[in-house]
Amino acid sequence: MTHRDVFVVSTARTAIGTFGGSLKDVPNTQLATTAVKAAIARSGLAPDAVGHVVMGNVIPTDTKDAYLSRVAAIDAGCPIETPAFNVNRLCGSGLQAIISAAQAIGYGDCDVAVGGGSESMSRGPYFDTAARYGARMGDAKSIDYMLGILHDPWQKMHMGITAENVAERYKISREMQDQLACESQRRAAAAIAAGYFKDQIVPVEIATRKGTVLFQEDEHVRAATT
């Protein structure tokens, strides 16, 4: 089977929000559509040239997220005939989407594909497991889907504990971690101040009582960290 060369011709992303921050009321499908639409526009190609759309997503936040890729494709202007599918590889979901999009081109399924990912942990739902058929007797339990996904399904271990285990195994002290974290915050703040990310970011429109505002700068960076 012949494998064709694949090239990245355009990229786009939204600014990153903090947990429970400016993007907490913005649907995940809107975030995905915003990025996909901008990436297509920046490529100089028409939306009907896109032959495949692949989106990574870990935490569905709305019924539309079950077909996030297709919602983003259609709302970004792609024809209804354009194939689309979601992938879930946890933290690597967006990267896997890019790989899958590249494979679609490489093996001749299409000439143009869009690959990316969209996540809104702020909008992660709670599950009421007894709601459909009733609790019948005793207490009912509400499950934090977002927090649950951060746990290993076999050991029931939070991924934060994995970091503690790695630190212990490789003798990484708290001081070393703090130094790296502080330097990371400093670099991110400096990059934002210098405008290094502006060309990457496409603004997200947020409807407020005072009108529409544009969210276009990464929010979580703590510039004052020392």
Spell out what each predicted region is.
Residues 12-15, 56-60, 89-93, 117-122, ...:
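Acidic, glycine-rich active-site loops and adjacent beta-strand->loop/helix elements
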Residues 1-58, 62-72, 76, 83, ...:
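Conserved active-site "lid/cap" helical segment
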Residues 57-112, 153-161, 224-226:
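Conserved catalytic cysteine-centered active-site region
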Residues 111-166:
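Flexible glycine-/small-residue-enriched beta->alpha junction loops
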Residues 89-119, 167-196:
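Active-site-proximal alpha-helical scaffold in enzymes
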Residues 48-56, 83-88, 113-118, 178-183, ...:
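Beta-strand segments within the central parallel beta-sheet cores of soluble alpha/beta enzyme folds
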Residues 2-5, 47-51, 78-83, 93, ...:
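Short coil/turn connectors at secondary-structure junctions
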Residues 7, 13-14, 24-29, 33-34, ...:
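N-terminal extracellular/periplasmic Venus flytrap/periplasmic-binding protein-like
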